[in-house]
Amino acid sequence: MPKQAIIPAGTTTPIAPFVPGTMADGIVYVSGTLPFDKDNNVVHVGDASAQTRHVLETIQNVIATAGGTMDDVTFNMIMIKDWADYAKVNAVYAEFFPGTKPARYCIQCGLVKPDALVEIASIAHVGNKA
């Protein structure tokens, strides 16, 4: 099964050996996405809502580069640093998935940088649009 790297224009260079997304057989696998700027610094420090929006906009860009939309997302894996931010993360999340919601799981865990409050990885079925 051939796979294609999905790297949107202007994407941050990852700090580890991976790409923002990979597509195989019309399925886009979006890597764990953190609230980073172009220099891999955490943005919106202390604001879980703004960090969630930044992460979901980044994921949206990866999926769009593959020819899809957020409506194509079928599964999300959400990691939050502090369970107290759960409602804030959900409020922003709901804005990006107003129709049929994707399946998902959400866990509390430590993240790669101390100021990061949320990380999301996604799977989207876009077909062969790209």
Swiss-Prot record:
Keywords, comma-separated and alphabetical: Hydrolase
Keyword match Hydrolase: yes
Molecular function terms, GO-annotated: deaminase activity
GO cellular component, one term: cytosol
Reaction catalyzed: (Z)-3-aminoacrylate + H2O + H(+) = 3-oxopropanoate + NH4(+)
Top EC class, one word: hydrolase
Entry keyword annotation includes Hydrolase: yes
Any GO BP: nitrogen utilization
Entry EC number(s): 3.5.-.-
Function field: Involved in pyrimidine catabolism. Catalyzes the deamination of 3-aminoacrylate to malonic semialdehyde, a reaction that can also occur spontaneously. RutC may facilitate the reaction and modulate the metabolic fitness, rather than catalyzing essential functions.
Similarity section: Belongs to the RutC family.
The protein, known as: 3-aminoacrylate deaminase RutC
Organism of derivation: Variovorax paradoxus (strain S110)
Gene, per the UniProt record: rutC
